[in-house]
């Protein structure tokens, strides 16, 4: 189970990286993070089980924020695909600020909560010793790097467009209402 969890987190991170659809990219990311949880639970120590449960909670909260921002983009800007997000943060700065926070947490950048849960999973794997937990630890590192690539691809596209973003008709893209 440890080996399957390790393999799944890399494979699904690669699948997420390939996705052009914004919400589908987040969905594959969820599967990848569920394999972190599976890997940690399969270590079968108290520390690993606690880390697994912590990552379940942390990932749930952060992924809700990511999906809410993706839903706001879909509903208020009518954009579904990652290439369509070019320069959209100019029209939806609060939405993309929230997505940037979610991206930092999902990637595991300190001091965000995603770092804490991934740190505890990594510590549990290293404390057990042996080659299989260390292979899992390496898989978690590779997956975290892939997560940084596919999440910050969206962030950079939205905040720093490479090309002149196509003009969006006035009022067609705006922030979600507060209530």
Role assignments for model-derived ranges:
Residues 1-5:
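Extracellular interaction modules
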Residues 6-175:
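Hydrophobic transmembrane alpha-helices and their helix-loop junctions in integral membrane proteins
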